[in-house]
Amino acid sequence: MTLLEQVQIRLQGEPKADDAAQLQVLCDLARVRICLRIREPTLPALLEPIAADVVVKLFRRWNYEGIASEGADKISTTFVEDILAEYDEEFAAYRETKEEESGEKVVRFL
């Protein structure tokens, strides 16, 4: 099942969820950002469920530009800075597992 198909199933019945072109753009965006985060050229199948979660969140925030909270009694808006931040532990675990499997250690100079 493709990433787009997973997202379409999760968003089934939601308004504007039938716009495959918009969903594909969001799938591509999520895929690229996750690949950059984990330093892999392609999205591993193991991380596709996370990518689907990210796309659903991006879709639901499309019209809100990443608003995390709003107050009704006063005008107050907080924006989400990094939608992938909540998955950092999973990404780190993936990278560690890949390093262990390959037997290579990565040294980074600051």
Q: Residues of each region from the PLM?
A:
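Conserved short "hinge" loops at termini or chain/domain junctions
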Residues: 1-49, 93-110
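Generic preference for well-ordered secondary structure
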Residues: 14, 18, 39, 54, ...
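Amphipathic alpha-helical core segments of compact helical bundles
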Residues: 28-35, 52, 56-60, 64
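Short loop/turn elements at secondary-structure junctions
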Residues: 57-110
